[in-house]
């Protein structure tokens, strides 16, 4: 891959949420079909994307990515990934995180977890039961949040004051689309609502930003 392979277009920020009470940072972000979940360090917060109101709070550590498999939450916490019952907040199982504390984003797709490696500039597909690495995708940027939507793999980047949303090929890692965030609007966590929005964690801003997802298109060859 080269830096000039795909030119970026400006990301369209539709709405901002937060900061939330008692939370000065947002790490991972996921969407359960109704609520947006944000990992804020000591707690997981679920909020209504229509009203912006906080609906649930779980006392669970979350210092990086968050994912949802349709039933359970998965949360990067230090050097592990916790499988959490969102109804009770109980941790049902834990596996070692592949980066041993250096992990960033987290997503669920194809029956597996996809884990962003920030400084290693990689995305790993891992077995959700064992943590075994099934696939490695190389990036040429620091990787933050990771999201899968309609078969498309997207990840956030964060270098200095610049962040992008990138659509990449799941086999080669080639960059297919780039959405550039305004300077200073950085991306930590990332998740799609399954429709036309991405929810982007804003790191130390304590905010979550809704960004317009581009219409799905056939990748150019």
Question: What residue ranges belong to the model's regions?
Answer:
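Blade/loop signatures of beta-propeller domains
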Residues: 1-12
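A short beta-strand motif characteristic of beta-propeller blades
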Residues: 12-20, 52-58, 90-96, 132-137, ...
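Beta-rich, blade/repeat-based domains predominating
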Residues: 20-33, 60-70, 98-110, 140-150, ...
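Conserved beta-strand positions in repeat-built beta-propeller and related beta-rich domains
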Residues: 37-42, 73-79, 115-120, 155-160, ...
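WD40 beta-propeller blade core
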Residues: 45-46, 82, 124, 166, ...
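Short loop/turn segments that connect beta-strands within beta-propeller blades
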Residues: 48-52, 85-89, 127-131, 169-173, ...
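Blade-level signature of beta-propeller repeat domains, shared across WD40, Kelch, NHL, RCC1
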Residues: 187-221
């Amino acid at each position: 891959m080269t830096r000039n392979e795909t030119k970026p277009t400006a990301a369209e920020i539709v709405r901002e949420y937060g900061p939330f009470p008692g939370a000065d940072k947002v790490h991972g972000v996921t969407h359960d079909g109704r609520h947006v979940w944000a990992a804020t360090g000591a707690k997981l917060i679920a909020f209504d994307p229509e009203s912006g109101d906080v609906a649930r709070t779980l006392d669970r550590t979350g210092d990086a990515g968050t994912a949802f498999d349709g039933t359970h939450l998965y949360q990067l916490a230090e050097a592990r990934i916790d499988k959490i019952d969102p109804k009770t907040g109980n941790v049902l199982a834990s596996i070692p995180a592949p980066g041993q504390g250096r992990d960033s984003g987290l997503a669920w797709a194809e029956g597996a977890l996809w884990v962003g490696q920030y400084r290693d500039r990689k995305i790993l597909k891992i077995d959700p039961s064992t943590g075994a690495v099934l696939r490695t995708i190389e990036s040429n940027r620091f990787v933050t949040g990771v999201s899968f939507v309609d078969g498309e793999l997207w990840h956030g980047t964060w270098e200095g004051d610049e962040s992008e949303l990138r659509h990449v090929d799941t086999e080669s890692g080639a960059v297919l689309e780039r959405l550039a965030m305004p300077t200073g609007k950085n991306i930590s966590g990332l998740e799609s609502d399954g429709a036309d929005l991405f929810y982007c964690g804003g790191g130390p801003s304590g905010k979550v930003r809704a960004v317009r997802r581009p219409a799905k298109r056939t990748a150019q060859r």
